[in-house]
C-alpha cells in the first residue's frame, strides 16, 4: 500500500514539473512573438494606375500649350514644352525633347522625330529667317539629332547624330548623312546629298532615291500605329478578340 502511494506521488510531482516547463516555454514564446501586421483593404494592382516616370509629357508655358493631333503618336517619356505643334500622322519617339519656350516648333504631317532628339528654337535668327523650328511634311529626323531654329522642307532625311544650327535651311528632297553638322545660315540645296562636319556637298540624288524619302516616313508612320494602340485608355485585348471573330467568320 505504501509503495503504491509513493509511486502515485512521484507521478504527480513529475507531471506538475512537466506542466510548469511547458507553461514557461509558452509564456516565453508569447513574449518573443512578433506582432501581426495590420492588413488594410486596398484596390488590386490591376485597378491602380501606376506612373514610374516622374515627368510630365505636356508642359504649358504661360499662354502656350503644346498641341498634338488626335492620330499623332507621342511616346510616354517625350517632353513637349510651350509652343509645340505636332500635326496629323506624325510621331515623336522615346526620350525626345521639344522645347518651344522661346519660339515655335512645328512637326509636319507624317513626319517623325526619333529617339533622344532635342529640338529647340531661339528668340531670333542671325540670317533674318524665321527663328522658329519648322519640320515640314514627310521628314525623317534620325535619333540623337539636335535642331535649333532651322527649317526642313518637305521630304527630307536628317541622319542620326546630326546638328542643324540657327538659320540653317534644308530644301525639299534632300538627305543629310549621319553625324553631319550644318553651320548657322547654311543652305542645303534641293535634291542633294550632304554630309560631314561642317556639312559639304557629296553628290546629287537620283530620282529613285528621292522617291524613297516619303516612303520611309510613311513606313515609320505605320509602325507608330502599333505603339499608339498600346497606350489607349483601355487594354488592346478587344483587338485580338475582333481578329479572332473575323477568323471564325463572325461579324464584328
Swiss-Prot record:
Against SUPFAM superfamilies, the record matches this protein to:
Trimeric LpxA-like enzymes
Q: Which residues bind Zn(2+)?
A: 120
Annotated compartments:
Mitochondrion membrane
| Swiss-Prot/TrEMBL keywords | Membrane, Metal-binding, Mitochondrion, Transit peptide, Zinc
Task: Report membrane topology.
Answer: Peripheral membrane protein
Q: Does the keyword rRNA-binding apply?
A: no
Quote the InterPro entries the UniProt record gives.
LbH_gamma_CA-like (IPR047324), Transf_Hexapept/Carb_Anhydrase (IPR050484), Trimer_LpxA-like_sf (IPR011004)
For this record, an example GO cellular component is:
mitochondrial membrane
Q: How does it assemble?
A: Component of the mitochondrial oxidoreductase respiratory chain complex I; element of the extra matrix-exposed domain, which is attached to the membrane arm of this complex. Interacts with GAMMACA2.
What function does the entry list?
Involved in complex I assembly in mitochondria and respiration.
Tell me the protein's name: Gamma carbonic anhydrase-like 1, mitochondrial
